[in-house]
């Protein structure tokens, strides 16, 4: 996958993507990240990319010309089709389902906002998608872009090195992940569930599924309501509810 990012702060993307899993992905040509400073497409002597809003009001808006020219230049350089994603608090909510959707594309173009927002013509006539990572305010779209890039890249075959890794992540199947334990088996008097030491993989898988259901039910009931439960899942949920009731 190729990911083109348009930003006013290209330096912000250097360190996070030169480490760990993403670096291995780029070294293995699984992901290619290209960063563009759209200030380079502002042609006045001050290279201004923002201006005050018509009608008055606080803050400055990003002008349409530099962004349109930047995207057009990127597409001239490589005409591979791509969704043009605007990162904005007005966009659709980003989640694992959206990450899976984006991971199917051969290429993404991501626009990072700044200041008070965009001239509306960017939203209406340039962007093909608009995404928000949450109901809070950030200084710019760069951190949001990093979140999207990281979540999407993990889903590209070969990036994690194991097909099971991304499938087992929290949210990947609609459930929060089950608890994990490693050595030592007892730490400061705290042990681990006996089933994990049993060697019985069927029982271990059952325990993991049950604890995934339990954790999602308790911590994210909004997610739990959307999960299609099998007969086995329903039986496990009945056990969970009985155990919770017994504990008071």
Swiss-Prot record:
UniProt subcellular location: Cytoplasm
The enzyme's E.C. designation: 2.1.1.228
GO biological process entries: tRNA N1-guanine methylation
Residues holding S-adenosyl-L-methionine: 113, 133-138
Role summary: Specifically methylates guanosine-37 in various tRNAs.
Family: Belongs to the RNA methyltransferase TrmD family.
Descriptive protein name: tRNA (guanine-N(1)-)-methyltransferase
Biological source species: Dehalococcoides mccartyi (strain CBDB1)
